């Protein structure tokens, strides 16, 4: 039986036995690599119902196939069909047709014969239109035509009344036919990725619609008509441009999922609380500043995402969201969580990354189901003890680079409240700046790439900076949310963060600092405060550029200054620069005795001093007379003295009050950004993608605890302030918040005026330490402290909309104009605690970078108050530094008039009446204002008058008076009162008038930083420095020994940093076409205050710190368009240091540099030049150089590649391909700003010296002298240079913008290589100057030539701040002196290196680490200073670490404890250095300038 069955089983299938044909209805030939339809198919044409030919290579369908009359489903997707044969009409029973992923261009008209068709899938075909016959397929229920080329639908499309699903994603539809209202059964409609600019009117008539996708269109409004869709369950409107949601959306009663991500929403309607069935609400990536309380009515809400907004608080009603399971509030500005959050007991995942949380409520312990909690990138000091109740917690993220999801927590008592708290080694958190360097240009940005590469390659040896130091320095803790006045009380603890922990991640530190700085981004007054923070108590007005607005800012001294702020909706480069300059020409307090009258009055700021804020851009500034002659030897601070105090102050800076540092301001700032970054300080971030991030870092750096500087070391305080700017060694630079500190000086009265934005520089005079931020991209922070701050990830933090806001960057540049707060803050700094600095200018600036990028990416980018003001241009507020007691007598008012749009004029010159004594005012002339004018330089190097610059700055003859400012530095002593108010502004106004794109690190800044970076030398109570004085020709007249007298630390110290940063900013602006939309006026770019020599050193440090900012600048460069800029987080990026800040710093720095630079080593500047590659000097180096050559620093720092410089097209992004280096015009623009005309010779305080060359002051003149094709030449030169970076060339590259730009040797501190060449307009200003500038630049060029050596020298000099190195630097300066004759263009072409390598033996005692980072080596990232050299190079030196006085960035390590490092692999070198015991003997090669 069994056998029989088996036999039958086998036979039955056989047809012979069955006696009938088998019925085959389904054939599947999918994925058979068929090139044609198999013939076997035709054997079953009677029975075949389904045929699958998916994923073959069939090119055509045979006619025989259409004889299969019974075919109901034909599936031939993913083949090579080019058409559907008309014979398809014979398939009358066909119900489903799938021809997706072919090359079918159209449906045949007779498709209408397939009456039974219900489903057509024809996606991913080049179908451009549907035939009329298509609408006769009346049984069609599902139609999929995604990713086709449809531009319209047939007018009678509504005949398909049975249609239930219609997917038309990724077409080119702009409208829908009105007949579609007949589609009564339509439930799902997908119109995503089309070109709708408004919601089609017919939609609200499709009453049964349940799912609607309208994402990725161009909708600007979500109309109330959507509320008619009562059945709507799912609505996706993400990735549009929606600015408002109508209240009537509440009509969608059935709505469960509402997606509004990535729009431009600034608020949600209260009626959203009526969507009772809502389970998912996504409003991430918008511009929300608050959430409606009615959100608590969404009782069924399970997922809520409001990340990447500008929220400063969550509504307490969030506690009613009892069904909530996922809560994401990343990348906002939350300082705290509502206690009611504990009522959300069902939350399993909560992410609070990148906020400003300083503590968490105990009630979080009630969220028993919490499994994942992300708290990374906040400012938490500990966790509440109630965390022990979270039994289900599986992941607690406290850091982005945390190795394990859960890490053990220890219990300890809170130091203040004595409550039990949980902590571990990751606390307290440091604000971190994102290292986001986005490019807003389509072209490759070699400079940015190089910087990023260097960062990736950098190995940082632990600089054992205690966390506390980092905290103090990096964080401006209480400042964040405080009102400016509150801040004044609390004092900004802008302690420079030490490089210790952060040395490895200077950017991170900077970012942290910035984040820590709670300064409201939008508080322009804060920025003012920073400026006021400068020693001067004088009330400084934000740049008048915002003349349209009139604001009265109370000065620290209590005087009110009425500033008319012009709003320039879309400032053009020159205009912006001039605006910035105007800002810089703020009215100083009469108490300072400095009165700046700008020949071009923009507005009259009614100040007690009645300083005029003349804002006419074109008008040449009136000759400035220093009534007080600034020369008060007694008050003057010797460089040495300044330096020591500098070192001290960074550690214990006086409390800084950030004026107007109200978080609210941040919103304003976004507004400002929207208004085109009124405060140019933002420009860095905004200007370029790079810029934003760097700006951020700069921002954090700027928050130096100037306020906390010890009163005992008043001089030291100022010095430290300067140092913060200038000296990497001081944590201050990291704090870089000095700007804030400066703000602090600003009286609370100033704070309220948000509209007044102080230029970035104003906001960041102190912050210019942050210069390192700019530089940091390319280099390991040379000066750990300043650099770290500068290195803040802020730089990298992405400026979301940066690309869109190209204009903003420009504005930022402008914003730079400002008074360095440091000046005000100097010695009196601690005293002015009561003064409230304006809200963090950086916060505003932070926003600036780009509405999109910055917002999320630059938490630490504080858009400084300058930006915070709603004013569209940063220059509208010159910083009105509150008159904070400082080395400058509070009475000294800084008027910075930056009227000329070109900035070329000495318009910036205001008459500054300095008190004879410590209150001497430093004239910070916006570098951009005297783009090419040497006056500033003269001021800086009180001794010599730069004929070049001065020629150009022929603005009603600037009289440069050497004005010794005790408050400044000894070099500052001869702050000649240049006729250029901006120069005078320099320190006080932060010299921020020079608004350099922040993204571009300024070599100057770097140098500045370097100078101050040497913490120990600065710390010295007093020092003797040899200051080389230069005559007008910039020929060294001799070395003057300057003793650091005990002076109030010149505000310039911080300012220096600011100056430094401004320089960088400018560079960045130049670098990134967008950011550099228009080059800020040269003067602005180069505006520096003129600190004493010591201050100069500080300035150097500051610049050095700015070095890292180069990345920022670049970033802004690459990306922001002015619109985006505006969109950028208005105030959301408080952390981000606005480029203006950086600029301001540079400007400040200029003054400082001029004065301190005597002692500063020119090489450092040079080194700074080499910073980008070889060009980028180490931060410290740069600082030192900056000290010596303030002007240069600013410009040099700017990497051309970061932004292609489009001097002509303000808004247009230049093709970066030419090179990241700025066009000559860009460089030229920078040049004047960079120049701090303060004599280098500390002693030379002759007014006559300062007076030198008043005639050439007009920058426009210098522009005129530039060859017509100078930009092209510059770009070519830059590009060539970029492409072939030999070691010498690399330094040249660094010089790129800096190398030949500096007008004279003294300018070397601001090497203005090609990349620093300002635009033609600037050249005009610098007119004949340009060539003199060129001479100057040639100094820069020389610095570039000397870069390798100079960097070393500068480092040494800065480290020691002792005469030996300074002497060398002066000699190099002397060398430069002769070079002044060089043309900018000429210098551009030149690659010659004046430097020579020299070997040194250095012994470092580990404590606990070596305190420096290395790069290069075989298989290493390469040497940032000399990419062609495969040796091991020092890229960052912890400012206060064991190597701070011994090594400089750029040093090549030849041996270590007998081990040769010549041909060593990178990893081996790192391991070897780490393996050494306590003492390490190094043989290093440093390039010294001849």
UniProtKB/Swiss-Prot annotation:
Comp. bias (Polar residues): 677-686, 787-799, 1194-1217, 1286-1307
Intracellular or extracellular location(s): Cytoplasm; Postsynaptic density
GO cellular component: actin cytoskeleton; adherens junction; axon initial segment; basolateral plasma membrane; cytosol; dendritic spine; filopodium; glutamatergic synapse
Keyword Lipoprotein: no
Residue list for modification Phosphothreonine: 831, 865
Modified residues (Phosphoserine): 439, 441, 443, 850, 869, 947, 949, 1118, 1233, 1288, 1392
Tissue specificity comment: Brain-specific. Highly concentrated at synapses.
Entries under PROSITE patterns matching the protein: LRR (PS51450), PDZ (PS50106)
Biased segments, Low complexity type: 687-700, 859-871
Domain PDZ positions: 1398-1488
Omega-N-methylarginine: residues carrying this PTM: 1149
Principal location listed in the UniProt entry: cytoplasm
SUPFAM superfamilies for the chain: L domain-like, PDZ domain-like, RNI-like
UniProt key word Nucleotide-binding: no
Similarity comment: Belongs to the LAP (LRR and PDZ) protein family.
Protein task: Required for normal synaptic spine architecture and function. Necessary for DISC1 and GRM5 localization to postsynaptic density complexes and for both N-methyl D-aspartate receptor-dependent and metabotropic glutamate receptor-dependent long term depression.
Name of the protein described by the UniProt record: Leucine-rich repeat-containing protein 7
Annotated source species: Rattus norvegicus (Rat)
